[in-house]
Amino acid sequence: MALQNMIPTQGDERGKVISYGSCQFPTLGFVVDRYLRVRNFVPEPFWYIKVAHTKDKIDVKFNWRRGHLFDRMAVIIIFERCLLAKTAKVIKMAKKPTKKWKPLPLTTVELQKNGSRFLRMTSQEVMKVAEDLYTKGWISYPRTETDQFDRGMDLRALVARQTQDNAWGQFAQSLMDGGFKQPRDGRNNDKAHPPIHPVNYVASTQLNQNEKRVYEFVVRRFLACCSEDAVGEATDIEIDYGGEFFHAHGLTVIARNYLNVYPYDKWVSSQELPQYTVGETFEPTEANTHDGQTSAPAYLTEPELIALMDANGIGTDATMAEHIAKVQEREYVIARPKGGSGAPANNDNGGGRGRGRGRGGARGGRGGRGGRGGAAAQNGGGGTVGIQEFIPTTLGVALIEGYDNVGIETSLSKPFLRKEVGACSCCGVGAGRCQNQALANTLDRWKFR
């Protein structure tokens, strides 16, 4: 940082801080890494086959098991082999019960991720509001890694306090009337604080707009935890058409259960599938080839960034939001509404990201339109209205590229050095090593080579 004092600054540039932080820079590194992947992305064309069949007045769309291929001629040859077969044979027809699991009890990291995704607030704003709600006695301590409730907690008493609310009171009452189920146990217990949950009821008229959003999310998450999993029936059909395999999937939601109080998860019935029998043969109503191209990944969003930081040990549940705010304050990163330059499309063919258009028509003729690129997420999840994505500034990119070339063996912009230092410190304490030795090992990692 000695160079900073040698560079003349004028006007608004005077007094700006350019600093290195062992958590701050990996945070910036995640943003820059995704940005470079987007900027350097080169789309590739691909081709795939889709088959359709109408039975009992229901149009069934079969997706190619291969997904897609990047060799057009290979797809054409395979497609012609399918056409020569003329008929398809059903080799699998299965209906089985399925569930969408209710959410785990709420941790700080999950509160920040979901707050950024659903509440139109930054993670720092979410934590500030949560702390205010805790201070006022409405929710439990909002800084916790615990995602399991102790068996001794009287959760029913907490549910009962929510029965008076106009929005979710009826659902809370249904839990009191026999619908209550013990929450799922996660893997984490910090032995200090329980999962985040409402401790008292407060009317929305007593809260400001942001407090309403956070309090409602905490309450609905808690009630969802105390409810039953959503129940459905999944139908899977697989056919053999000219030696190639195609499949169709259908879902019927039977009981929404926790979804009735937790609108942040989406799980809806898909296309209705008619009854087939194994061994049945039929002539496809339509068989088409489609082309598309891979598309660049999206820029990093705040929920994704928090997840990366959590997985790589960058910051704690109490400091992640601060690190994200700091790289914006230093003007290394700017935030903008997600999809500002167009959101990438999804491919119902399940073969990768990209956009596609159909070729051919019934039995291989021309006409028709295809699907969009990319496998759509199958695990539900709510909308993304209000989510922000991060774009590094020229300064942010320059800092990462500069620090990557200073001569240290382990990159300063990656999470590995910070993780190694943390592991070394923990190991030193746990094994009773000499503190000076642990310090020497840490300093050695930072030496220029």
Located regions from the model:
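Core catalytic DNA strand-manipulation module of type IA topoisomerases
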Residues: 1-449
